[in-house]
Amino acid sequence: MSGSKRLVLIDQAVVSGTGFLITVVLVRALGLGVFGTFALIELGALFALSLQQSRLGQPLLTFAPKQPDAQRPSYFAAALRLELWFTLVLAVLVAGTYGVYLDHWDAPATLGTWIPVTLTIVSRQLFAYLRAECFATGRVRRALCLDLLAYPTALVVLTVIWSRGELTLARTFWVLGGAASIACLAALPGVAGRGVKPQSLRETGAKHWGFARWLAGMSVAQFFASNSFLVAAAALLGAPAAGAIKAAQRVMGVLHLGFQAMENVVPVSAARLLAAEGMTRFRSYLTRILTLGFLATALISAGIAIFARFVLDLVYEGVVDDRMVLGLRAMAVLYVASFTITVLQIGFRTLETTRVVFAAYMANTFVAVVSAQPVVERFGYAGAVWGMAAQQGLMAALLLFEWRRAGLTSARSSSA
């Protein structure tokens, strides 16, 4: 394994490991009820991040390696300016939307969260861009240093406040948003494109939009597809049910190490292979990753599902119940499908055929949105967690079907 790939794995271990430990602290300190409220607010942060990734982060990782050396600095300069505009617009939208939401949300735990929640959502998406820029320029060590500043710092501060018995939801978001903001300030002076005359923002934005118009729609579809059952569980069963689901999901965070490493490494490698060696080599590379990764993910997930209660007792001692055990087993199945989806999406993005992914997400979203409420009403918590797993399985099946169709078409065209 090369030094850069080793650093990527270390970096993802830092991100996934601290994210998991933060969840452990929050569940133990706040309880499943307040943690469920935290999880619902966090959905807003994930939605903003998914939009940023589709409009800026993913195009950056795809287009940057393809830029001629002479044009690359000006491309990064244009991408940075687009990101700063996105950050400004997002700050206004989040502050206004969450403020209105608080006026109609009768939840005492949310008192004093307006400013820190806005800070957390905005700073985290900006940090995600700055982090992606490090990987796009091959500065993996820099990304690791920034992640060490953002994530372990937050974990240490949260743990100290918890040990004093003073951790609240508002303080949680102050810590998370503050740590991300500090990391952004540390990253900005050395960001690629700073001080360079940018390419035309209109042309760069149009290029990103041409690539991401389906990805942006897909991000919206993915958000509703992935969270319909969680929201239905929270609405029908209460915030503790949502907290139990998210707590079980976070235990599967061990698999995020591989998933997130792929998102940072595989798109760049796949784009270079496609440009330098053609379709056959590109398809062989993705197929190998899909096959070996699927087997590894299935093996790990099976072990976690079999020993679900033992694993949960190790992590959340004192708060584990039967709902969390059932949730962890369902999440183990879900993550096998999620791996397949991750690899196939990378393949379609590299081929710049994101319309296929968008269509699959729209079909999957329709099924999830229509079925979530009646399934949870009929089957309760079990319907929520197994519905989430089934929804991911459907998405994986749709993408795999389209990938095989694309593979057959490529093979025929290359042999003609």
Q: Can you name each region flagged by the protein language model?
A:
Residues M1, R141, C145, G165-V175, ...:
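Interhelical loop/hinge segments that connect adjacent transmembrane helices in multipass membrane
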Residues S2, S123-C145, V333-A360:
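Membrane-interface junctions at transmembrane-helix termini in multi-pass inner-membrane proteins
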Residues S2-G57, R213-P240, V369, Q373, ...:
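Signature of the first transmembrane helix
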Residues L7-G19, I41, S50-G99, P108, ...:
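Membrane-water interface segments that mark the loop-to-transmembrane alpha-helix transition
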Residues E42-S50, M218, Q222, S226, ...:
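Transmembrane helix-bundle signature of multi-pass secondary active exporters and lipid flippases
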Residues Q52-D69, A136, A248, M252-E277, ...:
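Helix-loop junctions and terminal segments of transmembrane helices
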Residues V100-P116, I306-V336:
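Interfacial segments at transmembrane-helix termini and the short loops linking adjacent helices
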Residues L111-T118, L144-R194, A363-V367, Y381-R405:
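Hydrophobic alpha-helical transmembrane segments
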